[in-house]
Amino acid sequence: KGKAGSPYAITDYYDIDPDLAENVSMRMTEWESLIERTHKAGMKVIMDFVPNHVAREYHSIRKPAGVRDLGEDDDPNMHFSIKNNFYYTWGDLDLNDVRQSKPEFKAYSEKDAKIYEPYEESPAKATGNDRFDNRPGCNDWYETVKLNYGIDYCDAGGRSYHYEPVPSTWGKMTDILLYWASKGVDGFRCDMAEMVPTAFWSYATQILKSRFPEIVVIGEVYDPNQYRNYVKAGFDYLYDKVGM
């Protein structure tokens, strides 16, 4: 993934990757045309949905009018708040360990400082693979930040759950699912679904399926002990990549 990050570092949930378009300015029209052609051919469209984390530099430029961006109303002085979309750590983001172990980072910084654009966060957000300090390493998902679904991971007792009132992130992520379903998507492949609480999935799938009864929801879940819980939460299919 290197400096560019992985395709699972989402920069805008409401946009189409410009690299996939023939005409960048018409990328949404091209996407809608793709769905139409697929349906005419008798096939279905299953879209990737990455709910656990976003890019560190997430900023939606295509969100519908009136939609508040993720983190736009956050209080970064709060490590955890049910009103925040992200988790915040103490101190600035420190990627020194990544720079030292990733040659592409080192090459950029030493060769030409003008083209080297380091991630800057103050305070740093928690990293997508549940790292809650400000110094992710090269084996962490350092280019991503964890979304807050109402779980305080650093509570004195380990974890505490805060689902009432409904966390801000729940509403925003459900709206994203509804947006793409309204475009004609037939289902979603939910990346690392088990890193997101089943309480959210129950909330989101009930709303989604009440408006789009034929929608299919597929979850990436690795713990067999959790299969029943995720099926009860509204998933139609579960899978893992073990042995692939």
Question: For the regions a protein language model found, what residue spans apply to each?
Answer:
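Substrate-binding/active-site clefts of carbohydrate-active enzymes
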Residues: 1-172, 176-179, 227
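Active-site-proximal helices and loops of the catalytic beta/alpha 8
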Residues: 35, 53, 62, 66-68, ...
